[in-house]
Design a protein with these regions (language model features):
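Structural signature of tandem-repeat unit edges
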Residues: 1-12, 22-35, 45-58, 68-84, ...
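Consensus positions within tandem repeat domains that build extended binding/scaffold surfaces
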Residues: 14-19, 37-42, 61-63
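Short, structured coil segments at secondary-structure junctions
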Residues: 88-90
Length: 97
């Protein structure tokens, strides 16, 4: 799976939702999402860019296990939970425009 379109009004990205999607490269999480759960992106080894909106207020500590941290860039909102999480966990990040 290279591209995924979220259904309207999705509130969370569930446990193991994208587990092993090795061809997934970029994803934009909609601003209806508040939670990224346990190993939601586990082993998404080709993931290079993820946009996480300010609406996300919880990211499980294992959500990105197995992703290549040195190649993954988070696009976040300044002052958001995602920015704080990225800093605390040493993810590369940039600010959304």
């Amino acid at each position: 799976m290279v591209e995924f379109v979220f259904p309207e009004n999705v509130k969370s990205i569930s446990n193991y939702f994208f587990y092993g999607c090795i061809s997934l490269k970029e994803i934009v999480i909609p601003d209806t999402v508040t939670t990224i759960d346990f190993r939601a992106f586990w082993d998404c080894t080709s993931l290079t860019r993820i946009t996480i909106p300010a609406s996300v207020t919880k990211i499980d500590s294992t959500a990105f296990d197995g992703c290549k941290k040195d190649k993954l860039v988070w696009v976040v909102t300044r002052g958001s939970y995602a920015e704080t999480y990225a800093k605390k966990n040493y993810y590369h990040y940039t600010y959304a425009k």
